[in-house]
Every structure is written in C-alpha cells, then in structure tokens.
Amino acid sequence: TQSSIHTEAYEKSVDLYNQGEYLQAFHSLLDYLNADFRTKYGNTDGTEFHIPHGSILVHISVKDGFYRISADFLNLPEKGRVAMLRQIADLNLNKLLLPRFVKDNDKLRMEYTCSLSQSHPHKMYFVLQNICHIGDKYDDEFCTKFGATRCYEPQVTSYPQEEIDRIYEGLQILGRETLEAVK
C-alpha cells in the first residue's frame, strides 16, 4: 500500500514556519502526516481538528495565538485508581516529553499548549507522536491491569479481503525469495 506521508509537505512546513506563517506551517505538517487530515477532521477555518488515532481522539485547537493539543486517555477505575495514578505519574516524568497527563474528575487526558511562535514543525511532530505513542502503548495495559475504561472506542476500518490476500501473497513471495537468496 502507498504511504500517506508526503515528505515535500514537511519541508514546506519548515519553510513556512521560518517565514512566520505558523498556522500554514502546521497545516503543511498535517498534510505531511496525512493529506486527508485537514479535510476529514478539521473545521473550515483550519483552527480545530479532531483526529482519531487508535483508542484516543487527538483534539487540536488554534486560538488566541496558542496551540492546544489534548487527547482523552482513560476513565479511572473505582478500584485500583491510586496504583494507576502512580504509574501515570511515572509516565508524566519519564515517558511524556512535553505533553503531560491531567486528571479531570475521573478522566485522564494528555495535553500540551504552546504559542504559535514556538511551534516548530519538528517539535509539533514529536509532541503528536509522543501523545499517540503513549495512548497506543498504555491504554490496553491500564484497562487490563487496573480496570480503566476507554474514553473513545477505536474506529477500525478493515482492508478489503482481496487487498489482504494481495499483501499476504506478496509477503510470502518475499519470504521465499529471501530464503532462496541466503541458501
């Protein structure tokens, strides 16, 4: 399958940032990640986005000269919440780099805020990557280990069976050819 990443859009994003065109730079960064993000998940002004990623929904808002990025993570369980919060504190200190976990009643979310002028595309890419990685890596573990529940159910879109068969056959051929080459 073809990658949804467009490298020229990243370079354009950096150029736009260096010219002080911060919102356009962020739009280009989103285009780099996936050309459909802005049209599928953004508002017409390009100042608000709600992008699904696995079991989290990443909310991005541009308002009053700031980016606000947040993602609801999990609902805290009745039992085991103290132990879970200890592990969340560890993630806050050791795994989340710029974003942080925030407790809002019985809900945990990751959030990050910065001014438009401090939003270099490289930094914003890693902020989004960090939020998505932590959301992917720890949601199942905390649901299983502590009984937490998801704030957002993943939207899974399956590939058509013929696409699955084509990819599987391609991998089988690649494996056979590789084994033949190393004999």
Where are these regions (language model features)?
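Charged, amphipathic alpha-helical linkers/stalks
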Residues: T144-K183
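Well-ordered alpha/beta subsegment
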Residues: V102-F126
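Pleckstrin homology
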Residues: K137-K145
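N-terminal catalytic cores of peptidoglycan-degrading enzymes
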Residues: T1-E78
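Exposed alpha-helical structural elements
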Residues: Q24-S28, G80-Q87, R166
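Short, internal acidic amphipathic alpha-helical interface segments
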Residues: S70-N105
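Short amphipathic C-terminal alpha-helix that caps PH/PH-like domains
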Residues: M124-Y138
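N-terminal non-globular leader segments, chiefly Sec-dependent signal peptides
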Residues: Q2-E11, C114, Q161, Y168-L171
